Amino acid sequence: MSETKRVRVRYAPSPTGFLHIGNARTALFNYLFARHNDGDFIIRIEDTDAKRNVADGEESQMKNLKWLGMDWDEGVDVPGKYGPYRQSERQSIYEPLIQQLLDKGLAYKCYCTEEELEAEREKQKANGEMPRYSGKCRHLTKEQQAEKEAQGFKPSIRFKVPANETITFNDMVKDDVSFESNGIGDFVIAKKDGIPTYNFAVAVDDHLMEISHVLRGDDHISNTPKQILIYNAFGWEPPIFGHMTLIVNESRRKLSKRDGSIIQFIEQYRDLGYLPEALFNFIAMLGWSPEGEEEIFSKEEFIKMFDPKRLSKSPALFDNVKLTWVNNQYVKKLPLNDVVELSLPHLQKAGVVSADLDQAELDWVHKLVSLYHEQMSYGAEIVPLSEMFFADAESITFDEEEKAVLAEETVPKVISAFKKELEALDVLEAAEVKSAIKRVQKETGVKGKGLFMPIRIVTTGEMHGPELPLAIEVLGLEKVLNRLDTWLQNN
């Protein structure tokens, strides 16, 4: 294919569920490649497998792509001259092309039942052979075909794979790749109901939509020789292919939808309060890297930098720790109001903040979130981070390390003195808390960790956390006095 041909790439999901992280990466790399080359990014819906399609699957895919920050030049919702953009609406395009292959003797009708095919596969496996179709319907005469149809058999259509050919292509990621045609076997291009199979529809659509580059996951590489054979049968020029390495988990195993250790769907990250810009950034680095050590880039910077030559030849590690770090970098840059907006739905869902909160409660939420602004990695994290602000005094428990601190003989007088200081206050503000702690130090003669740690542990239930005077201010006078009093009564 000519390198000067206009870049046209596509993301072609099946509407079988939510947008998976692997599919999001495929879409993103195609998007970046198109935008970098001032080309076209197309969304095509591959919905011919009606049994697997789910309600709202198509809408969910596009909604989440938009949320991540991608737009496209053609698609179901952006009509163009290469439509329709749903494969289910392109049947009238596929049928004459299938017939053309039949007429040329490059395809044939196959009447084998699923049971026969399964028996054939099992026999091949038992003999240590690679399972593939034997071609037994390849040489049926017209009379034999008519007899089969008279008996009620409906044919599928199989492509005649030429013998003893080496199918070679230069891959953008893997360099030169070759397959032997003898290992492929005649493959189905139209099912018994006349619906084309994936490989046929994809090859036809990519050609008719003038797709210049096909950038997709490594799990598709075995489809590529079949698609090239279809291109060759019609005398078409194949696109340039690029097969990205798979995404693996920390055990270096291929990311599986059954792997519960990793959240794998964009919708879930969205629901947890991750930022789209951060996910865009993280996904863009899954199997691709820029020059240098920097890891945080804007969408515009990624578009400017993106070069498929920098796609990794090694599997891409999905690192949860890295993802939360990346998201935290973006959260830290947000204005506090935006972080409150990100956090509030999760506090409300947890039932610790009113669904219909008044201005005073909203002001309090601003103070609460400000304590964790630098630390928060995503919106929902505010709930576990701030749980000590909502706990009853009676429910607070201490671990062994905390108990050891509270067992020091000076602790009761520190807590008593601090309680007395707070009881004298009309308003609990951080500055007043600081002054109160200084007065406790003067009165008791206790300073440093022996002073601060018991106060922190008894008031917050934690040894570590936000700046103590600020945390006590946000807790509020009533709650703090209750916790101090409860501890004194029990010790």
UniProtKB/Swiss-Prot annotation:
For this protein, the record's InterPro entries field holds: aa-tRNA-synth_I_cd-bd (IPR045462), aa-tRNA-synth_I_codon-bd_sub2 (IPR020751), aa-tRNA-synth_I_CS (IPR001412), aa_tRNA-synth_I_cd-bd_sf (IPR008925), Glu-tRNA-ligase_bac/mito (IPR004527), Glu/Gln-tRNA-synth (IPR000924), Glu/Gln-tRNA-synth_Ib_cat-dom (IPR020058), GluQ/Sye (IPR049940)
Reaction equations catalysed:
tRNA(Glu) + L-glutamate + ATP = L-glutamyl-tRNA(Glu) + AMP + diphosphate
Task: Tell me a GO cellular component.
Answer: cytosol
Requisite cofactors: Zn(2+)
* Top-level taxon: Bacteria
Bilayer-crossing regions = none
Task: List where in the cell it is found.
Answer: Cytoplasm
Show where the record puts the motif 'HIGH' region.
13-23
Residues annotated as binding Zn(2+) are 110, 112, 137, 139
Chain location of the short sequence motif 'KMSKS' region per the record:
254-258
Quaternary context: Monomer.
Function, as annotated, reads: Catalyzes the attachment of glutamate to tRNA(Glu) in a two-step reaction: glutamate is first activated by ATP to form Glu-AMP and then transferred to the acceptor end of tRNA(Glu).
| Name recorded for this polypeptide | Glutamate--tRNA ligase
Q: Which organism is it from?
A: Listeria innocua serovar 6a (strain ATCC BAA-680 / CLIP 11262)
Gene field = gltX
